[in-house]
């Protein structure tokens, strides 16, 4: 789904508006190997404070699930950069698995990651995704046993998303050595490409994770924080993503 060395920016759909989200997507797509577009949810338990607040802002502004597909359809008029939708299972369940995935595919999504759907309960989802031609992405944590990691790798048709830290998302100044140990372990086990996220905020971290064996690096909270405090978020976002991706692709 993406080239080795790619930066993968995460954006929350609808924060602060549908129109701004489209502007953000167009600002970063030139420098992104793939984009994660998060679907706002009222209880984003896996996310840290920064991304949680972005979900809440979008929902307070009246954001609806259909707005995600509307943003993506408009984005597809301008760009072919791969996009995966990142969601919790509740919106998928409420919509219906087949209907949700059908709308995602029709709007231009390339894949989907359901944060709180374990592989062991993903049978219907996997069948429907295969039918629609959508790539599937599953999460693995540092404490995921090797055998479980093999199961996740087998179920993933897009890439495996490695959580570099225990706990929720959020930018950190430094990543612990356990994050790099996990990447090296997963590299020996997984056949899929590996994307690493949670806690990444600086280009030095991107470089370190790629050297450890990651194929792509996800940056989310640092970008959402920039958007929330900037007076010129489109230009600052573009500059930040260009900086991070340029550093990663120079390896």
From Swiss-Prot:
Gene Ontology molecular function terms on file: tryptophan synthase activity
EC number of the protein: 4.2.1.20
Reactions it catalyzes: (1S,2R)-1-C-(indol-3-yl)glycerol 3-phosphate + L-serine = D-glyceraldehyde 3-phosphate + L-tryptophan + H2O
Alphabetical list of Pfam families matching this protein: Trp_syntA (PF00290)
Keywords assigned by UniProt, alphabetized: Amino-acid biosynthesis, Aromatic amino acid biosynthesis, Lyase, Tryptophan biosynthesis
Keyword flag Metal-binding: no
One GO cellular component term noted in the UniProt record for this chain: cytosol
Single GO biological process annotation from the record: L-tryptophan biosynthetic process
InterPro entries, A to Z: Aldolase_TIM, RibuloseP-bd_barrel, Trp_synthase_alpha_AS, Trp_synthase_suA
Pathway involvement of the protein, from the record: Amino-acid biosynthesis; L-tryptophan biosynthesis; L-tryptophan from chorismate: step 5/5
Active site (catalytic residues): 36 (proton acceptor), 47 (proton acceptor)
Protein function: The alpha subunit is responsible for the aldol cleavage of indoleglycerol phosphate to indole and glyceraldehyde 3-phosphate.
Family classification: Belongs to the TrpA family.
NCBIfam families reported in the protein's UniProt record: trpA
Subunit details: Tetramer of two alpha and two beta chains.
HAMAP family: Trp_synth_alpha
Protein name in the entry: Tryptophan synthase alpha chain
Species in which this protein is naturally found: Thermococcus kodakarensis (strain ATCC BAA-918 / JCM 12380 / KOD1)
Lineage: Archaea, Methanobacteriati, Methanobacteriota, Thermococci, Thermococcales
Gene: trpA
């Amino acid at each position: 789904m993406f080239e080795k060395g790619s930066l993968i920016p995460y954006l929350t759909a609808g924060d602060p508006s549908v129109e701004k989200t489209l502007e953000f997507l167009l600002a970063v797509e030139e420098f992104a190997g793939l984009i994660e577009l998060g679907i706002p949810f009222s209880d984003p338990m896996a996310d840290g404070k920064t991304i949680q607040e972005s979900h809440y802002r979008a929902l307070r502004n009246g954001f609806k699930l259909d707005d995600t597909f509307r943003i993506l359809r408009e984005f597809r008029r301008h760009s072919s950069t791969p996009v995966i939708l990142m969601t919790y299972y509740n919106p998928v369940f409420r919509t219906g698995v087949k209907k949700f995935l059908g709308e995602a595919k029709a709007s231009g999504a390339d894949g989907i990651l359901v944060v709180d759907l374990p592989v062991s309960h993903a049978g219907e989802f996997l069948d429907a995704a295969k039918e629609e031609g959508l790539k599937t992405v599953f999460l693995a944590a540092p404490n995921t046993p090797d055998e479980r990691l093999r199961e996740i790798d087998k179920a993933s048709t897009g890439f495996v998303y490695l959580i570099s830290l225990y706990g929720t998302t959020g930018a950190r100044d430094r990543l612990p050595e356990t994050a790099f140990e996990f990447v090296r372990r997963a590299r020996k086990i997984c056949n899929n490409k590996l994307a690493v996220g949670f806690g990444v905020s600086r280009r030095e971290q991107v470089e370190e994770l790629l050297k450890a064996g990651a194929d792509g690096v996800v940056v989310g909270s640092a970008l959402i924080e920039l958007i929330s405090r900037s007076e010129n978020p489109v230009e600052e976002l573009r500059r930040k993503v260009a900086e991070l991706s340029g550093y990663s692709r120079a390896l």
